[in-house]
């Protein structure tokens, strides 16, 4: 079973969503199904079919979240040195073609927020820079083609969700 690294915030966020699905949304959709069923013929009952579809989506998400939480590896990135790129590292990189600098922080798969510069540790660019040190170059295949980057700095900054 492959572990999924995430922060405590990410774990708590997923656990809260799972609790809401089980405690609120699942019982509510059962009531919706019962109400729709009481309206008669199920073959042509759009309300019933919509509620059943909603139930299937909720059950699917419950299974997905349960699996993810079972595989979660909660990591405190402040507890270790960031001398190389790891989960929780804030990394400044430079595109060697354009000389454009970008800053990214590597977070769990459910914590990405590009507006804040938080990228999933499972993303191609994050995977390519894992384990690299300041001054190292790395290549990554992006939608626009292969690009080469240099790591300018690595440090730890507390996550601000």
Swiss-Prot record:
Keyword Transcription regulation among UniProt keywords: yes
Key words, A-Z: DNA-binding, Transcription, Transcription regulation
InterPro entries according to UniProt: GreA/GreB_C_sf (IPR036953), TF_GreA/GreB_CS (IPR018151), Tscrpt_elong_fac_GreA (IPR006359), Tscrpt_elong_fac_GreA/B (IPR028624), Tscrpt_elong_fac_GreA/B_C (IPR001437), Tscrpt_elong_fac_GreA/B_fam (IPR023459), Tscrpt_elong_fac_GreA/B_N (IPR022691), Tscrpt_elong_fac_GreA/B_N_sf (IPR036805)
Pfam family, one: GreA_GreB
GO biological process: DNA-templated transcription elongation; regulation of DNA-templated transcription elongation
GO molecular function per UniProt: DNA binding; RNA polymerase binding
Similarity comment: family membership: Belongs to the GreA/GreB family.
Function summary: Necessary for efficient RNA polymerase transcription elongation past template-encoded arresting sites. The arresting sites in DNA have the property of trapping a certain fraction of elongating RNA polymerases that pass through, resulting in locked ternary complexes. Cleavage of the nascent transcript by cleavage factors such as GreA or GreB allows the resumption of elongation from the new 3'terminus. GreA releases sequences of 2 to 3 nucleotides.
Record-linked PANTHER family: TRANSCRIPTION ELONGATION FACTOR GREA (PTHR30437:SF4)
Xref: NCBIfam families: greA, PRK00226.1-2, PRK00226.1-4, PRK00226.1-5
Protein's name according to its UniProt entry: Transcription elongation factor GreA
Organism: Campylobacter jejuni subsp. doylei (strain ATCC BAA-1458 / RM4099 / 269.97)
């Amino acid at each position: 079973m492959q572990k999924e690294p995430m922060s405590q915030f990410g774990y708590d966020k997923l656990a809260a969503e799972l609790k809401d699905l089980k405690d609120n949304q699942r019982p509510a959709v059962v009531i919706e199904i019962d109400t729709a069923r009481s309206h008669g013929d199920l073959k042509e009952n759009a309300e019933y079919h919509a509620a059943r579809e909603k139930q299937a989506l909720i059950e699917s998400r419950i299974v997905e979240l349960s699996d993810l939480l079972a595989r979660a590896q909660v990591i405190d990135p402040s507890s270790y040195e960031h001398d190389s790129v790891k989960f929780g590292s804030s990394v400044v990189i430079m595109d060697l073609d354009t000389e454009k600098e970008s800053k990214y922080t590597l977070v769990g798969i459910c914590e990405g927020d590009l507006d804040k510069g938080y990228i999933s540790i499972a993303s191609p660019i994050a995977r390519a820079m894992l384990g690299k040190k300041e001054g190292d170059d790395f290549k990554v295949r992006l939608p626009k083609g292969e690009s080469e980057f240099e790591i300018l700095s690595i440090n730890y900054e507390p996550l601000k969700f």
